[in-house]
Amino acid sequence: MNILPKSIPIRIQSLRRYQGSLKTSLRALSTRPIFEKRLLAETPFSIRPSNASVLIAKRSPKFGWKQVRFYAANPNGGNFRMDLGGGRKQGAALEEYGTDLTALAKQGKLDPVIGREEEIQRTIQILSRRTKNNPALVGPAGVGKTAIMEGLASRIIRGEVPESMKDKRVIVLDLGALISGAKFRGDFEERLKSVLSDLEGAEGKVILFVDEMHLLLGFGKAEGSIDASNLLKPALARGKLHCCGATTLEEYRKYIEKDAALARRFQAVMVNEPSVADTISILRGLKERYEVHHGVRITDDALVTAATYSARYITDRFLPDKAIDLVDEACSSLRLQQESKPDELRRLDRQIMTIQIELESLRKETDTTSVERREKLESKLTDLKEEQDKLSAAWEEERKLLDSIKKAKTELEQARIELERTQREGNYARASELQYAIIPELERSVPKEEKTLEEKKPSMVHDSVTSDDIAVVVSRATGIPTTNLMRGERDKLLNMEQTIGKKIIGQDEALKAIADAVRLSRAGLQNTNRPLASFLFLGPTGVGKTALTKALAEFLFDTDKAMIRFDMSEFQEKHTIARLIGSPPGYIGYEESGELTEAVRRKPYAVLLFDELEKAHHDITNLLLQVLDEGFLTDSQGRKVDFRSTLIVMTSNLGSDILVADPSTTVTPKSRDAVMDVVQKYYPPEFLNRIDDQIVFNKLSEKNLEDIVNVRLDEVQQRLNDRRIILTVTEAARKWLAEKGYSPAYGARPLNRLIQKRILNTMAMKIIQGEIKSDENVVIDVLDGELEFKANKLEPQSTSHED
């Protein structure tokens, strides 16, 4: 029964309210029984209830149970630092932050290491020292520094090491795991300290390998506390820690040599790039692993091509890594082709689907035409399905053979790994069975199935990686044509002079020199240590020096925009050289790459044009000396840029006054000698001596100009095609243009201006006024010494023909 008046609850709600929490001491008392029970249950040593009260008072209210540190009485005396939930056992840090290479070697998961005998032996010698037994593998990225430690782990497993190195473990430190989650100051140092403690506790039985060691040594500096290098120094000096690091020469100089105390604790082992021959041996050793992984065959020609092409065309990386990447990518490309439907089957599927859709639309039609059409489609559909079934069966059969070969190779590899393991474990009964029964049977079955596949001559599936596949990968990555010449390309190269000669009139000598250089390159006979070719084009203005270079780029790449052009009038000052290779350190723009070096790095197969070279500063020629002779140029960042796949053209107007004064339209020996005298006085001999050919262009004759008129009018017609306007120029008008546009001193440029002024400007006005419309034929003739324009409506067949 409610005895309170109804007004009291309303009154209470109107009063001021206070909210808050219990005091810390009260909250501690309320949680005390729970905490005492948990603490006594999880502490790995005996603790008195009286101490539990002290522990509760010492805990920080800011953190949860896992982050709170407690101090309890150690039964042996003194204080013992502990984490709630139990202490860390010996070696736990190495398990958490490391990967055991020797365990992976036992399982056969490491690739075989070919060569590197000297580097591995040197590493073992340093590890066997009493103090400062810490090798540092120093070398460029991709030369195989990590592989040396994998080779050491494999040798330890096989027992191919000195007695003092047997039964040791090689553990790779995982820097990502070591850093991740270290949110609070001191967390990283504590983790590293636990790793070092585990290593010292292993008593020399563990070799710690730190890949990218310069990253580890720099950690901790940002927090202002003791960094990793200072934690490592005492252990490294005492010899209690077997640590092997790997880094590049640049990072070694930047992070380790700068600290003399740290540098003297490591012994550098230089790991140089292997030769092409050594790389081929490495690829042959890895061949079986990649065949098993991808399920394809790799020919020996493909391995040789991968090593030679990677050394020749991929210059910004190092062997053997870049060669292995070529083989791996070629294998993956072939594997995708095998797992996808062949093009013939996909084409049949599309045809069948199209017919089925059409049949569905004709299903309810009853007229005679529709019925006949339906019968024809049904007959065609039956034939296509029969062909589809036949091809599908052949494809499935070929795929089954390939899968069978892949399965046999996988079983053979697993059997060999098991044989090594059983021999180590002393299980000689199983080892005997593997060595004399299982492995020989598998070794016989693999060639047998491969022979069966070859006899069937598979047409649907390509089963082998060849040198052509490697060449395709190189071409795709660099843009450099390395594939074998196809029939159409052969004909194109053989007729190169005639093709370019349709646009460049009257310069047969220059065309021949350019065509010979390109053919030499595509045949693979050019000097591999120089650019494809280098030319100096000399002659008066307007004779086609720049136009020939544009036509060459269009011939090679189907667009004249593939040419990299530098107008040398922009480089008249000495400081503008920095624009080509990048600014030196300390100057504005140092981080930006040079215009020349960056363009060639991005497009190594290109036509380089240095237009009007004589207008540039003389130091530009000194810069080009190395490019013309060695095919390399070093930019401001220290990167070597490869120019060996470029074709370099330099144009100049030096001596043009001599050629203009000569009445002959072709270059006479006397004129040539006079021009070359001027050139030799202007450029140093070491520059001219490095150029492959110096070509003097002919003056344009009146007959040449008539041919150029036809070329220019064809270009005008290309612009009018979009408007469906046909341009018809009479023979009289063509001769009028050639006469009015001829100038021995200025070449073809006056003709271009004449066509612009007398034809294009007039037609533009008439189009805007509506006098010339689409689908009309514009006839240009000469009347009273001037050009006359007449527009006639096109016949329908003419319009369709032009379209």
UniProtKB/Swiss-Prot annotation:
Residues 94-342 are annotated as: NBD1. ATP binds at residues 139-146, 539-546. InterPro entries: AAA+_ATPase, ATPase_AAA_core, Clp_ATPase_C, ClpA/B, ClpA/B_CS1, ClpA/B_CS2, ClpA/ClpB_AAA_lid, ClpA_ClpB. Residues 1-36 form a transit peptide. SMART domains: AAA (SM00382), ClpB_D2-small (SM01086). Its main location: mitochondrion. Residues 343-431 form a coiled coil. One of its GO terms (cellular component) is mitochondrial matrix. Keywords: ATP-binding, Chaperone, Coiled coil, Mitochondrion, Nucleotide-binding, Repeat, Stress response, Transit peptide. Belongs to the ClpA/ClpB family. Has 2 AAA ATPase type nucleotide-binding domains (NBDs) per monomer. NBD1 is primarily responsible for ATP hydrolysis. NBD2 is crucial for oligomerization. Required, in concert with mitochondrial Hsp70, for the dissociation, resolubilization and refolding of aggregates of damaged proteins in the mitochondrial matrix after heat stress. May extract proteins from aggregates by unfolding and threading them in an ATP-dependent process through the axial channel of the protein hexamer, after which they can be refolded by the Hsp70 chaperone system. Required for resumption of mitochondrial respiratory function, DNA synthesis and morphology after heat stress. This is Heat shock protein 78, mitochondrial. The gene is hsp78.
